[in-house]
């Protein structure tokens, strides 16, 4: 099986990806792992990527696309199939992936799209607070401290509602054209993500069992 998994930050994509890999024995290909492996193995694209990262610059699409192609060309993919996680991030990368798969003679069989209401994600992602003295982490809604006094806690910039909302808005704007592109090919399977982790996986399992 050759799959993509998509979903907004906080939708539980990482958790479900791990469950899919364990149950269906496909190769889990995450963007971070790909970059680290390519740089460690000093592949042509890995060396190029490192040169940008060392300068503190963004890695251009053609290098990212090249790293993906290197990984998808490896022998284990032919044997196990793959679950691609964190790529493509833009419609341009989606078109590049289509081209890569066509060149390698690989067929994409399904996109698992975990859907969670953005307002729920905003609450989930922006609720983290940290105790100023102990450094303990809590969540305003899901794991509130017993003795909550606002002045005793702080939030990291990344966790503040306005920062989280910006991140979600960017992800929505980038993700919608990708979903539309693959939906037109009949590949997208929407999964309700606002339920228990095991129920989410049960829904995914039904979809993937029918794909086999």
Curated annotation (Swiss-Prot):
Gene3D superfamilies for this protein: P-loop containing nucleotide triphosphate hydrolases
Self-association and partners: Monomer.
Function, as annotated: Catalyzes the reversible transfer of the terminal phosphate group between ATP and AMP. Plays an important role in cellular energy homeostasis and in adenine nucleotide metabolism.
Domain remarks: Consists of three domains, a large central CORE domain and two small peripheral domains, NMPbind and LID, which undergo movements during catalysis. The LID domain closes over the site of phosphoryl transfer upon ATP binding. Assembling and dissambling the active center during each catalytic cycle provides an effective means to prevent ATP hydrolysis.
Positions that bind AMP: 31, 36, 57-59, 86-89, 93, 156, 167
Region (NMP): 30-59
Annotated GO MF terms: adenylate kinase activity; ATP binding
Name listed for the protein in its UniProt record: Adenylate kinase
Gene: adk
GO biological process: AMP salvage
